[in-house]
Amino acid sequence: MDLLCSLTDGERQTGIERIYLDVKFLRRERESKTLTSGKFTPANALLILVDGENSGEVFRAPIDGYQGSTFKQLSINDNMNTDYMLQIINMHRQTLRENKVGSAIPHLNKKLFKAIEVPIPPYKEQQRIVKAINIAFKHLDTIMESL
């Protein structure tokens, strides 16, 4: 995983009013708050939760804003299909949640995150895998609705 993606902070900005991209806003549990300084996150950037109980959960920034304090920006190598990588991360989410570090506030175990082994099929195969996963989830949704 270490060679395929990176966890970074956005560039620090001041004097520009932007939405604060915290977990409650991204989950639509709260209205937006604005700040005049913070770590810039462009719209559509991926944010991974690195602090708290749900470490490893990934969000897509809906608009330009300032990165929440419990996030890192997740950058995926251009040679990898983003949805494929997100499926790999999601597949390991429970392991990441169960192996957090820190006592007072649990944190994403970045060493474990970087050590995730990722099969690297050709790009077209990554796309095919994502399509197959999406179809399987649609079938599961249909089954769940019929229960």
Stretches with model-predicted labels:
Residues 90-93, 97:
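Short amphipathic alpha-helical signal-transduction/dimerization elements
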